[in-house]
Amino acid sequence: ISTLWEGWELNSATYGGGTYNHGWTGGPATLLSQYVAGISPLANGFKTYKIQPQIGLLTSIKAQVPCPAGLIKVNIQNTPQQFTLSAEVPIGMQGVISVPILADIYSEITCNGTVIFANDKYINALPWLDLVPGNEHYLNFEVKNGGKIVFVGKNRK
């Protein structure tokens, strides 16, 4: 859905509205992109961003959010074999991407094809990426520049 109608029964005798798009019906789209896909600003005007998806039992999530620098796009695939979070962020933007810790299942995590986490330890292999403090639910990575960023968590089993 690219446009959310103010009412679904437009032009019916029982509906008194008259526009095809209204701000308050955009709430679900905002909630899905901000909380399920996890795309949110860390600073005013989206100067920095955070991507922290809340996957639950979903097997895929795809979202994009406009910001002053351009579009932030997220595509997530979650299978029993691996977890993939692909993000496209405008060049020059800094932010944090959080990889969910789905139990204790990752044998390794790669970023853009380079191993960055193995044997339960972070490997500082990319100059534009750092592990930053998180919690028991996420591994948080500070990304120092935009572009295409792909995290792949390969499952132990």
Where are the language model's segments positioned?
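Non-catalytic C-terminal accessory modules of carbohydrate-active enzymes
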Residues: 1-157
